[in-house]
Amino acid sequence: TALRSIGFARPARPVEEVPAAYAKKLKAQAAEHEGRAAATEEELKQCAPAREDLKLLSDYYRLRAQKYEALGEILQSEKTCMITGFIPKRDAKGLEEKLNSRFELAVESSDVPEDEEAPVLLSNGTFAASAEGVTASFGLPAKGEMDPTGIMAACYVFLFGLMLSDAAYGFIVFLMCFLALKKFPRMEENLRKSLRLFMYCGLSTLFWGVMFGGYFGDAVDIVSRTYFGHTVTIPALWFVPLNDPMKLLVYSMLFGVIHLFLGLGLKGYMLLKDGKVVDFICDVVLWYLLLLGLILMLLPTELFGSIAQMNIVFPPVLNSLAKGMAIVGALGILVMSARDKKNPILRLALGAYDLYNITGWVSDVLSYSRLLALGLATGVIASVINQMGSMVGNNVFGVIVFILVFCFGHLFNLAINLLGAYVHTCRLQYVEFFGKFYEGGGKAFRPFKQITKYVEIKED
C-alpha cells in the first residue's frame, strides 16, 4: 500500500530478467526477424524471371484440383461412368451434339420434374446483369418467382444517385470504375459486374448533381469568391436541396410511393401469371384502392400543404371518389384478407390484423426520407470542407492549405457517403421493395468449367 501510494505498480507480466536487458533481447530478436524478412525479399526478387512460369503452374494445379473435385462426385466403375447434372435448356442440344461427336456414349435430357428444385442461372442484359450481385446477396429467385434484377437495377441506380447527388463525385466514381474495367479486362466476373454497376451509379450521381447544382458541394462559389474576388455560381437545373429541403422530402416520399407501388404491381403480375385472379384482386387491387384513396385524401389537407408548401384543391367529386376508394379497399381487405378461413369471427379478426398493416406502409414510405438525409449530408459536409479550406485566406499559404483540405476532405466525404449510399440503397431494395413481392431462396447454378486466374485458355 505504501509503495502504491507513491506510484509503484506490479508489472503486468513479471519477468525474471532486468527490464532493460529483456528489452534489449527483444530488440535483438526483432532485428533478426527483420534480417530474415529482407533476405526472403531478396530471394523473391531473384525469382522474378520465373514469375510467368509460376503463374502457369498455379493455374495448372488449380485446374487439376477442379477436375478431381468433380470426379469425386461422379458415379463410376472400372469401365463406365454416369454423369448427371443441370444445363440451361437453350444449351442442351449443343452439348448433346458436341458429346456425341467426341465420345461413345448415351445422352438423355429431360425437363426438371415439378417436385425438384432446379438451380438458378440469371440471364440479363448488360445493364441488368451488373446488379445480379445485389439480387444474389438477398437470395436468388425461388421456383415460380420472377427475376427482379432488371427492374431493381433501374431503381437501384436511380436511388443511389439521388442519395450521393454531387456531379463531381459522380464523375469521379464513373471515371474510376470505367478505367478499372478497361485496365483489368481479366478481373473476376462478379467484381466486373459490381464495378459496372457503380459506373452506372456514378452516371446517376452526375445527373442528380447537375439537377441539384452540386459540384464538390459549393466549391465553385467559394473558390471564385475567395481567390478571384467575385462569385461564380453554376445554377441548378431543378433546385438546391440545401435551400429547399422540404421540397426534396416531398419528392423523396413520392419516389418511395412509386417504388413501393411498383413492388405491389409486380406481386400482382406474378399472381396473374399463375392464374390466381381472386388473389390478385384481394391482395393487390384492394390495397391499391385503399392506398390511393388515402393519398388523395391527404393531398388537399393543411398538414400536407404545410409540409409541401403548396396548396392542392380537388373538386368535390374527386374528394368523394377518394373516400369511396379508401372505404371499399378497407372493407374488402377486412372481409377477404383471410378468405381461406371458414370461421367468420376468425376471418374478420385476421382481416383487421392485415388492415393494421397500413402502418407498415406508412413506415415504409417514411423510410425514403433517407434520400433527403443522405443527399443533404453529402452537400453539407462538402460545403463545410470548402469553408474550412478557405479560412486561411487568399495567399500562397492559404492556397496550399485549401488544396490539402480540399483533397483529403472530399476524399473522406466521397468514401463515407459512397458507403452510406450503397448500404441504404440496398436496404430500400431488400426491405421495402422486395418485401412487397419477392422472397428468394433459390440455389445458384454452378457449372463445371475451367476457372483460371492468370492464364486465358482458348479452344480451336
Annotated model-derived regions:
Residues T1-M152, A180, M187, L191-L195:
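Long, charged N-terminal accessory/stalk domains
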Residues K93-D460:
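Conserved, carboxylate-rich catalytic/transport cores that coordinate ions
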